[in-house]
Amino acid sequence: MFRGAKSGQARRCPVSGRRVVYTGSRSRSPSGEEAVDIDIDLVTRARAGDSSAFAELVEQHRRELEVHCYRLLGSAQDAEDAVQETFLAAWQHMPAFEVRASVRTWLYRIATNWCLGALRSARRRPPREVFVPKPPSPAPTSPSEVIWLEPYPDVLLDGLPDEMPGPAARYQAREAISLAFVTALQLLPPRQRVVLVLRDVLGYRAREVASMLDTTEESVTSALRHARANLRHRLPRPADPPPAPGSLAEQAIVERLTMAYETGDVNALVSLLSEDVTISAPLAAGQYAGTAVARPFLETAVFPPGRTYRLIPTRANGQPAFGVYVRDPATGVFHVNGMLVLTLAGDRIRAMTRFDNTSIARFGLPRRLSPGPSAHQEV
């Protein structure tokens, strides 16, 4: 036990296993929020150094904190790391935690400020691979901007607690995890990004956000105004909304896309695309906008002669997604070739985003498939 821990005393974090030193500084929670997540006995034990009580106190918030950090950082791996650092800092400052404060908001405060520090220092992993299309592939219509972007598995979203956003929220939780929304967030300056997520996604009031960021309400209001204007420019709403997740309309698009991909039917694939479609890969040299450019890119870079694909459906960011596999002509084995995430608008595909192989394990997908045709390929 570490009852009455003093400044300079070392404690081992029960979540990460790392040793930390209590500095005596106070990590305050936003003032004025109703503390609805309090278990006073649990908090008291955690403050006294009870590691199992601390783990029980914070682990219930892990999933939602990871989603929060993912929105801010754009990388699922970086989000996991951020939450580990959050729990480490929380354990370090637990003796100074106010017993009747909100544990959830306190953790959000720590996580948000850790992410803000990471964004300001531009700590980004270098690209693991860079795909540069070779001639005769067409030139990209614009460069890639968010090379660190990663997809987020829907299975992790299903584990989120049933928390309603605050009264100031403008976005539904699922809307605020879409690939387009997360991409647009990455293009905002760090403080604008953080303020917009806290205010418009999580629904914290301006005074609460000001307390979390150690700033003024006026500064928060100004940052939010600029963030909303920038987001409107970066994230125009499509004329047609996407079909409901799991609906027959969505399933029909997924089935037709799978058949076109596995049979190498470029014409059938292009018929599914909207006129303003965007095909991109965060680590690629650029993105391809419009069917006039998308068709030759698909014909030359994606479906060259002799290449055969197999797709395994999954879901990412609340959207249809696939593990993509390419057949080895020598063995017939299908090897993983990245992930594909679809953005739908009405009955058309508005964006196709390809990610590298590093996300496969997080989605529980295999790295190879046995030889043999799929249901859409001839025997």
PLM region spans:
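Low-complexity, glycine/alanine/valine/leucine- and proline-rich hydrophobic stretches
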Residues: R295-V379
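Amphipathic alpha-helical segment used for protein-protein interaction
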Residues: D37, A48-S51, W148-Q192, S247-Q251, ...
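Hydrophobic-face residues of short alpha-helical interaction/recognition segments
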Residues: L65, C69, M94, L107, ...
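A short, charge-rich alpha-helical start-of-domain segment used by transcription regulators
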Residues: T44-V67, Q77, W91
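Short, basic/polar amphipathic helix motif occurring as a linker/hinge flanking DNA-binding modules
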Residues: Y108, A118-P151, R234-G246
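Solvent-exposed, charged amphipathic helical/linker segments at domain boundaries
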Residues: A206-M212, E217-R310
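Helix-turn-helix DNA-binding module
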Residues: Q186, P190-V194, L198-S219
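Sigma70-family region 2
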Residues: R47-A48, L72-A76, E85-V103, G117-P126, ...
